[in-house]
């Protein structure tokens, strides 16, 4: 608990981070996105009205918050402008409260074309990307050929750099993937349309956050996707292209790692995954279908159906280790209502019969393990919207306590519905 708080997903994304960020920003002065792009989909429900944010930090719905998009985020200008316009048409002021790092890499149309062409070429080995150019933009960043927000300050130089990088990428598109080239003239014209707006939002993010810290302002760092999709620590190669873990906060925003005081890990009471990749506890029976239906498990960004399974404490152990989780927020507890029994995966059994309590490092290793479960009685009572832990059925309380015991991490927040007030805060991350 403290002044600087990180909120991130501990599973394969879609854990319910957006709602929790929005809920806790009543005490924050700054909310910072530090990785990912508009492949994220954070769904918020306020007074029954649903808002889906893909790029702008969820704190934008709070008048007291300034929102920052840090250098670790790959920025799609067209997506940003669309989101800004939608928010402003709904009555939320954006332009005077949203700030950008000039080091943000730009996602441009050729990145999207490359992303789609590659997924198509992979066929049945497709990774399951959102097709929004995230990976190719990060590739350009690492290869030091990417264009950044700061390049927009000099359009003559920008045009030269754009010509060079598009010659390179259009060669790939036409000669290797056999698809049409992207028009240089069209891309440059589009950039000129929004360049001045983006420039007007540029600040020195490191300095802004450091001054905020020294004033005693409360700062929240909003993660996107989930720990198990981290480019280094996730189920590689079925991962995203950024560091979704707590270490990404420092590198993706320029904020000193020693100043982070609390890391809140968001976890569903079960597990979901969208797209390809290993998923040891995945259910292919009626229970899995029930979780999908009751949990409305369809991606906020792609609309794809999510795969559903039991809570995986083995994978969670790795998330705790990597992120130094201070406490959990357990979401969608109500989705488990009505089940005769609930299960927690407590180990992975190998082909030789040995049981391990840590996951493999890469996707291939999951082919050799099967989950070992601990079963507990379910509950028939309705927990949707319950606002006090004392009002939960005893079986649900037992399930919560068992997760705490297995993981060694306290559950500080419990969510029983999509709205702000359908939440139990047992220990506030920003509490003094």
UniProtKB/Swiss-Prot annotation:
Entries under SUPFAM superfamilies matching the protein: P-loop containing nucleoside triphosphate hydrolases
Keyword Cytoplasm attributed: yes
Ranges in a coiled coil: none
Gene3D superfamilies for the chain: Adenylosuccinate Synthetase, subunit A, domain 1 (3.40.440.10), Adenylosuccinate Synthetase, subunit A, domain 2 (1.10.300.10), Adenylosuccinate Synthetase, subunit A, domain 3 (3.90.170.10)
Keywords attached to this entry: Cytoplasm, GTP-binding, Ligase, Magnesium, Metal-binding, Nucleotide-binding, Purine biosynthesis
Pathway noted in the entry: Purine metabolism; AMP biosynthesis via de novo pathway; AMP from IMP: step 1/2
Superkingdom as given in the UniProt entry: Bacteria
Active-site annotation: 14 (proton acceptor), 42 (proton donor)
Enzyme Commission number(s): 6.3.4.4
Residues that hold IMP according to the record: 14-17, 39-42, 130, 144, 225, 240, 304
Cysteine pairings via disulfide bonds: none
Entry-linked SMART domains: Adenylsucc_synt (SM00788)
Binding sites annotated in the UniProt record for Mg(2+): 14, 41
Localization (cell): Cytoplasm
Note accompanying the cofactor annotation: Binds 1 Mg(2+) ion per subunit.
Catalytic activity: IMP + L-aspartate + GTP = N(6)-(1,2-dicarboxyethyl)-AMP + GDP + phosphate + 2 H(+)
Cofactor(s) this protein cannot do without: Mg(2+)
Function comment: Plays an important role in the de novo pathway of purine nucleotide biosynthesis. Catalyzes the first committed step in the biosynthesis of AMP from IMP.
Subunit structure: Homodimer.
PANTHER family associated with the record: ADENYLOSUCCINATE SYNTHETASE
Protein's name according to its UniProt entry: Adenylosuccinate synthetase
Origin organism lineage: Bacteria, Pseudomonadati, Pseudomonadota, Gammaproteobacteria, Aeromonadales
Encoding gene, per UniProt annotation: purA
């Amino acid at each position: 608990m403290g002044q600087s708080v990180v909120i991130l997903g501990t599973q394969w994304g879609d854990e319910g981070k957006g709602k929790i960020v929005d809920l806790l920003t009543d005490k924050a002065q700054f909310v910072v996105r530090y990785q990912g792009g508009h492949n994220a989909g954070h769904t918020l429900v306020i007074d029954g009205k649903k808002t889906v944010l893909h790029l702008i930090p969820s704190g934008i719905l709070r008048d007291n918050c300034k929102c920052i998009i840090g250098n670790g985020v790959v920025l799609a200008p067209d997506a940003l402008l669309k989101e800004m316009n939608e928010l402003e048409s709904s009555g939320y002021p954006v332009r005077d409260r949203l700030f950008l790092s000039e080091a943000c890499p730009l996602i441009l149309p050729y990145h999207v074309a490359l992303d789609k062409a590659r997924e198509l070429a992979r066929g049945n080995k497709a990774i399951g990307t959102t097709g929004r150019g995230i990976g190719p933009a990060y590739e350009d960043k690492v290869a030091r050929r990417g264009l950044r927000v700061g390049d927009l300050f000099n359009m003559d130089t920008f045009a030269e750099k754009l010509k060079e990088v598009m010659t390179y990428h259009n060669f790939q598109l036409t000669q290797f993937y056999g698809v049409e080239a992207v028009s240089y003239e069209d891309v440059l014209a589009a950039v000129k349309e929004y360049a001045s707006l983006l420039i007007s939002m540029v600040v020195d993010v490191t300095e802004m956050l450091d001054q905020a810290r020294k004033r005693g302002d409360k700062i929240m760092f909003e993660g996107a996707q989930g720990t198990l999709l981290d480019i280094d620590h996730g189920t590689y190669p079925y991962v995203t292209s950024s560091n979704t873990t707590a270490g990404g906060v420092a590198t993706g925003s320029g904020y000193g790692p020693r100043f982070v005081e609390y890391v809140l890990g968001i976890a569903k009471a079960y597990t979901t995954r969208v797209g390809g990749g290993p998923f040891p506890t995945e259910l292919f029976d009626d229970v899995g279908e029930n979780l999908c239906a009751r949990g409305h498990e369809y991606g906020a960004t792609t609309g794809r159906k999510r795969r559903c399974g039991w809570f995986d404490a083995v994978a969670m152990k790795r998330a705790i280790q990597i992120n130094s989780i201070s406490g959990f927020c357990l979401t969608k507890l109500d989705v488990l209502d009505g089940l005769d029994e609930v299960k927690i995966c407590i180990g992975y059994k190998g082909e030789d019969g040995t049981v391990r309590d840590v996951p493999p490092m890469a996707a291939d290793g999951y082919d050799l393990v099967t989950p070992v479960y601990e079963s507990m009685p379910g509950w028939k009572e309705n927990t949707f919207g319950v606002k006090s832990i004392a009002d939960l059925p005893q079986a649900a309380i037992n399930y919560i306590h068992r997760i705490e015991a297995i993981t060694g991490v306290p559950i500080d927040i419990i969510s029983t519905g999509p709205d702000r007030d359908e939440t139990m805060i047992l220990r506030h991350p920003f509490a003094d």
